[in-house]
Amino acid sequence: MSNHWLLPENIADVLPSEARKIEELRRRMLDLFRTYGYELVMPPMLEYLESLLTGTGHDLDLRTLKLVDQLSGRTMGLRADITPQVARIDAHLLNRPGVTRLCYAGNVLHARPAGFHATREPIQIGAEIYGHAGLEADIEIQDLMLAALQAAGLSDVRIDMCHAGILEALLAGLPSIRKIEDALFAALETKDVPALRELTVGMPQTERDALLALPTLYGGVDVIDRARATLPASPAIGRALDELAALAVQVRGASVNIDLSDLRGYHYHSGVMFAAYVAGLPNYVARGGRYDKVGEAFGRARPATGFSLDLREVAALSPVEVRAQAIFAPWDADPALRAAISALRAAGEIVIQSLPGHTHELDEFNCDRQLVRQDAGWAVVPR
């Protein structure tokens, strides 16, 4: 039996009902971003590998599919994340002074799925602010992320916050940590305290105690006060906790948790990191944070903060109903009918003309009206 219809693992077609909802949410979110002053950019699907991975962490390299350009012989990559591309556009192509707000929407491709059931072809949409180092930019980005989730009909949202500066300060005096860095991050992210105890044997006691405490520093905003009492009283850690406290009180329309061991994207971020969750689901639905160092690789270090989400994931969770109202028209050679259909379509109506010999209903549309011939010509009436 032929299996030419099979697709690669974790790759799937988007069928009409899902595509309809994804497109509706994409339009809603891009329209929302525009009301905040964000400009749409469309980076290419593939770039030379050195450009695509510049300023990013090792994780992105592993997720990037590589191929050889038959024109130049150079290695290219299919993008696994649009955010570094937008940073390149801001730093190298636009090169504007002051604040720049950019947004994007497009497919990305992962060499490996992020999870057991995760797609390898997410549809990523997001927004970025460049040029402002203050917390005002982070507050705006978090507001925009929550507004985007609200536009998708998601409620009971929780934001988990962390700060890359805390771990950076703890590891600053431990150059030998690079040998166990990946294992250390994995243990912190999974809150595997026994593994942490084993990995931190031989470290200075102050840093070891702090690293072992990070997985326990999870919960409400009061965690910030617990962290001040538990972690070393360094200026860098104090600033990071101050920023988390200042951001937490500004969140509207969501509850706030602090999770000081949620370090996904640590190599990429330079400050506050945050993720949005909805009730009953273990995985985040949107994620973002500050990444001031990315543009430096393109010759222009700029403060930057942003967020992104996967439209396919959000559409699967969204209660939004998208079934367009349409007008049913018979097939007839009457020029007046063709003129009536053209006029309705020009006015933005969906008109579906029945082809000869077919009487089935289309589940894609709700044909609640129909065109019928009357004495005065063709008219729209309830169906």
UniProtKB/Swiss-Prot annotation:
Gene3D superfamilies: Bira Bifunctional Protein, Domain 2 (3.30.930.10)
Pathway where it operates: Amino-acid biosynthesis; L-histidine biosynthesis; L-histidine from 5-phospho-alpha-D-ribose 1-diphosphate: step 1/9
Iron found in the keyword field: no
GO cellular component, one term: cytoplasm
Compartment annotation: Cytoplasm
Keyword Cytoplasm: yes
InterPro entries in the record: aa-tRNA-synth_II/BPL/LPL, HisRS-like_core, HisRS/HisZ, HisZ
GO molecular function, one term: histidine-tRNA ligase activity
Gene Ontology terms: biological process: histidyl-tRNA aminoacylation; L-histidine biosynthetic process
UniProt keyword annotations, A-Z: Amino-acid biosynthesis, Cytoplasm, Histidine biosynthesis
Database matches in Pfam families: tRNA-synt_His
Other remarks on this protein: This function is generally fulfilled by the C-terminal part of HisG, which is missing in some bacteria such as this one.
Alphabetized NCBIfam families for the sequence: hisZ_biosyn_reg, PRK12292.1-1, PRK12421.1
HAMAP family recorded: HisZ
Subunit structure: Heteromultimer composed of HisG and HisZ subunits.
Job description of the protein: Required for the first step of histidine biosynthesis. May allow the feedback regulation of ATP phosphoribosyltransferase activity by histidine.
Family indicated by similarity: Belongs to the class-II aminoacyl-tRNA synthetase family. HisZ subfamily.
Protein name: ATP phosphoribosyltransferase regulatory subunit
Native organism: Cupriavidus necator (strain ATCC 17699 / DSM 428 / KCTC 22496 / NCIMB 10442 / H16 / Stanier 337)
Encoding gene per record: hisZ
